[in-house]
Curated annotation (Swiss-Prot):
Is synthesized initially as an inactive proenzyme. Formation of the active enzyme involves a self-maturation process in which the active site pyruvoyl group is generated from an internal serine residue via an autocatalytic post-translational modification. Two non-identical subunits are generated from the proenzyme in this reaction, and the pyruvate is formed at the N-terminus of the alpha chain, which is derived from the carboxyl end of the proenzyme. The gene is psd. It catalyses: a 1,2-diacyl-sn-glycero-3-phospho-L-serine + H(+) = a 1,2-diacyl-sn-glycero-3-phosphoethanolamine + CO2. Its main location: membrane. The lineage of its organism: Bacteria, Pseudomonadati, Pseudomonadota, Gammaproteobacteria, Vibrionales. One of its GO terms (molecular function) is phosphatidylserine decarboxylase activity. It comes from Vibrio cholerae serotype O1 (strain ATCC 39315 / El Tor Inaba N16961). Keywords: Cell membrane, Decarboxylase, Lipid biosynthesis, Lipid metabolism, Lyase, Membrane, Phospholipid biosynthesis, Phospholipid metabolism, Pyruvate, Zymogen. NCBIfam families: PS_decarb (TIGR00163). One of its GO terms (cellular component) is plasma membrane. This is Phosphatidylserine decarboxylase proenzyme. Pathway: Phospholipid metabolism; phosphatidylethanolamine biosynthesis; phosphatidylethanolamine from CDP-diacylglycerol: step 2/2. The keyword Lipid metabolism applies. The active site is at D89 (charge relay system), H146 (charge relay system), S252 (charge relay system), S252 (schiff-base intermediate with substrate).
């Protein structure tokens, strides 16, 4: 059955389906929208007690519900200049060392940092022998993505690709999943060196938005695009630890890359462990 589920993803019109779901999720359908939201909350056991607006009727579209804001204080940001915090509510899919330019996708599967970063060999070299963490956001999770540390944006890269599901089953069965799916790569300069925060798209992920650029995708295309940002001045993008940096409209995966000997993972990190935005997950080495 698992092979059938994975096999079907090669045959379905991923981009057309995603466009359709994106339009439906943005539609203002009144009581129908509310009914769908109520069903989703029950189906996925969504904790609405943490939401700033807990009444499903508050949301005019499904997307508004999906990127719901949390109440102030429910995700305190761990203090300490050397403390690196989880960027999202998720679970730990994989984490560890980048060895020979490769990251672990799942047991028996690896992929290259260079491919993940849009084929940029020079950029991948900055993370040689570094560390990575892959965090999977499930449907029930809070879907805004935050900064794990203070950072100044250096570059943003849009990489077109497939839109496979990114759940654990697919990660275990689709080679190069994260390096073949559509993604937005954000490179930040930090006090402990370069950091990549990669937002990976998936089937029915209607859009990826960033606070400094708005909606990056859609529209979708076949060309890798790069934007460079200054370190200073009016065009600089400087974000503090815990600040929102982006969001998924229907969720997906966040991947962090760190330079060699820049960090050490917190003892709480474990495969499959749930994460809460703002809690520690690494420390500056």
């Amino acid at each position: 059955m698992d092979k059938i589920k994975v096999g079907l993803q090669y045959w379905i019109p991923q981009h057309a389906l995603t466009r359709l779901v994106g339009k439906l999720a943005s539609a203002r359908a009144g009581s129908l929208t509310t009914a769908i939201i109520r069903w989703f909350i029950k189906q996925y056991n969504v904790n609405m007690d943490e939401a700033l607006h807990s009444d499903p009727t508050h949301f005019k579209t499904f997307n508004e519900f999906f990127v719901r804001e949390l109440k102030a204080g429910v995700r305190p940001i761990a203090e300490g200049e050397k403390v690196i915090t989880h960027p999202a509510d998720a679970c730990v899919s994989q984490f560890g060392a980048i060895e020979y330019g490769k990251l672990i996708q799942a047991k028996g599967h690896t992929y290259s940092a260079q491919e993940l970063l849009g084929g940029d060999a020079k950029l991948a070299e900055e993370f040689r022998d570094g560390d990575f963490a892959t965090l999977y956001l499930s449907p029930r999770d809070y879907h805004r993505v935050h900064m794990p540390c203070d950072g100044t944006l250096r570059q943003m890269i849009y990489v077109p690709g497939d839109l496979f599901s990114v759940n654990p089953l697919t990660a275990e069965n689709v080679p190069n999943l994260f390096a073949r799916n559509e993604r937005v790569v954000c490179i930040f300069d930090t006090e402990f060196g370069p950091m990549a925060q990669v937002l990976v798209g998936a089937t029915i992920v209607g859009s990826i938005e960033l606070v400094w650029a708005g909606t990056v995708t859609p529209p979708r295309g076949n060309t890798v695009y790069r934007w460079d940002y200054p370190a200073n001045g009016n065009q600089a993008v400087v974000l503090k630890k815990g600040e929102e940096m982006g969001r998924f409209k229907l969720g997906s995966t966040v991947i962090n890359l760190f330079a060699k000997q820049a960090i050490r993972f917190d003892d709480s990190m474990a495969l499959g462990a749930p994460t809460r935005m703002g809690e520690p997950y690494a420390h500056q080495a």
